[in-house]
Amino acid sequence: MQDIQLDKRLSELLSQAVTPHNAQPLMQALCQSLNEHNIRYYVDDAPSITDSEYDRLMQRLKQLEAEYPQFVAADSPTQRVGGMALAKFEQITHLKPMLSLDNAFDEADFSAFHKRVSDRVGEVSFCCEPKLDGLAVSILYRNGVLERAATRGDGTVGEDITENVKTIKSIPLKLRGDNYPELVEVRGEAFMPKAAFEALNERARLKDEKLFVNPRNAAAGSLRQLDSKITASRALSFYAYALGVVEPTSHELAKTHYEQLQQLKSWGLPVSSEIKVCDELSQVFAYYQDILTRRSYLPFEIDGVVMKVNDIAQQQTLGFVAKSPRWAIAYKFPAQEEMTLLEGVDFQVGRTGAVTPVARLKPVFVGGVTVSNATLHNADEIERLGVMVGDTVIIRRAGDVIPQIVAIVPERRPEDAKAIAFPQHCPVCGSLVERLEGEAVTRCSGGLFCEAQRKEAIKHFASRKALDIDGMGDKIVEQLIDKELVQSPADLFKLPASMMTMLDRMGMKSATNLAQAIEAAKTTTLPRFLYALGIREVGEATASNLATHFGSLEALRVATIEQLIQVEDIGEVVAQHVAHFFAQPHNLEVIDALIAAGVNWPTIAAPSADEQPLKGQTWVLTGTLNQLNRNDAKAQLQALGAKVAGSVSKNTDCLVAGEAAGSKLAKAQELGVKVIGEDELLALLANS
């Protein structure tokens, strides 16, 4: 009801002509509305207006504040963008010390903590929450308005980071409602979500700037910027985890820690959705294992879970020791970062030909396992890290992610450290390795010839969208190669049925059927053949465009990059990949062997204008089609000259909407794009 009254009052004020007399109440109503919508978005996860509506209200407030600066409120959402840069941070003495937590590293440690607690206060339940890997922050609200914010510092004295904290969108500048204390201190963790961290490092990488090692360092560095505009650009977030000082002390608060967190949430403060109350020791251990299992999938970094006695009266009975509360403990996960020695580098060749440097490490226990290898990704990463053989390095292992080197320890570099040099030839097949301009990855040029790429190349060659060899599944391909019956795609067409009976669970009847399917696959189309070759960046549509444009394999084999760029939807990068593929003798040998084995296709006649009525049009498919599969529909539209895109835009000519069409249909309707159903599509294809 209050929300309806707020919206109604704002609508009334917005409908009036603005004068010096009504500007202030209008600005106050806009602030109140925008702050409420911020909380609905960041805390309740239930936005009630669109982003464009929010932006419109924000723009109106900015215009009014520019015209009437004397009425700018301290809790205005416009104040989040950051103000003047500071010369230094002022010191703040905490009203109540911000203590650290004792740690538990295994079940025995936590069981001992549980015994100490229950011996003092009897039966207990715990409020369990993820231990965020960020920066502890104290935020003070007076009469509901954010007054100041500080870092934890040494627990007694921290730094004033008020202006920086105001830029964090999930932190309300004014508390929601009116049932909060006159003065309330909120404690929580400021952190950088994983997605924001990746985006920050990507921007730094593009500018050739130093990268942050992990989200915790990024969050700490962002909060301690003297220029709050920099903090505002860093997409920090915040979760409240406790109440600090409350005045007057007579203000009624919830009786359990969990309920107090819900109280904070009702005031508009974000609280983790992963919090849970556990009544039994077994439930605590199950919670720990659950969060540990899901750790790598959470949107933020954590390094353990925090267990707090849930009952506030029991907390008060237990009290504190010098540096930590007796009623809480951090149950830490196995370390994800450790230091070790880089003893050497090996080079591996992946299924796509990527040559990847793999660091050989002095074995070290990290992330719950012993690690002796870590990826170095590519030459750019080696250069960025400045890493050499013999260096002491920091390695990181997060969940199921392959361990990686994230930094070196320069002061420990020995005098005989050696630079890491990429090989000039593929360590598997001996072909030249090459790195195309603009690419980070170095690749083997062996293509279809390279043993490291062989299995995946032949699986792709036989797949449904390529030569479509019925019955030639992945396991069959793997057996053929493991038993050395096949070394290149052309060898498939030389296999007699009798030889295929050597495969596991392959009788003569099955072998005969497979041999017949291989024989049938000899007759194909040029687009399918080109797609089957596995040229980088050449999918079905590109293969079709190449075949249509050049008309023959012979013409395509000798095409220059300049000629390739003339093909529809082919840019310089794809043109380089195609030209590079046909320049490799190994690949030409495989193609010649395939043709000698009898692989053939009909001659392509250049389509007339009448045969391509959709030329120049962009179509999009969405939803489930019942009578056509998506690939067939796409291929038939392309044959009629249409470009089939993956998303709807103002340039889309038509959307084909099947069953359960979602956001693409809504966007098409919003943009006024023509929409047809599957029946209309079938009629169009039948008449073309």
Curated annotation (Swiss-Prot):
Xref: InterPro entries: BRCT_dom, BRCT_dom_sf, DisA/LigA_HHH, DNA_ligase, DNA_ligase_AS, DNA_ligase_CS, DNAligase_adenylation, DNAligase_N
Sequence intervals crossing the membrane: none
Any one Gene Ontology molecular-function term assigned to this protein's record: metal ion binding
Lineage: superkingdom: Bacteria
Domain BRCT: 609-688
EC number assigned by the record: 6.5.1.2
Residues that, per the record, bind Zn(2+): C426, C429, C444, C450
Cofactor: Mg(2+); Mn(2+)
Entries under SMART domains matching the protein: BRCT, HhH1, LIGANc
Alphabetically ordered keywords of this record: DNA damage, DNA repair, DNA replication, Ligase, Magnesium, Manganese, Metal-binding, NAD, Zinc
One Gene Ontology cellular component annotation held by this UniProt entry: cytosol
The reaction(s) this protein catalyses: NAD(+) + (deoxyribonucleotide)n-3'-hydroxyl + 5'-phospho-(deoxyribonucleotide)m = (deoxyribonucleotide)n+m + AMP + beta-nicotinamide D-nucleotide
Phosphoprotein found in the keyword field: no
PROSITE patterns: BRCT (PS50172), DNA_LIGASE_N1 (PS01055), DNA_LIGASE_N2 (PS01056)
Record function comment: DNA ligase that catalyzes the formation of phosphodiester linkages between 5'-phosphoryl and 3'-hydroxyl groups in double-stranded DNA using NAD as a coenzyme and as the energy source for the reaction. It is essential for DNA replication and repair of damaged DNA.
Assigned protein family: Belongs to the NAD-dependent DNA ligase family. LigA subfamily.
Protein name as catalogued: DNA ligase
Originating organism: Shewanella sp. (strain MR-4)
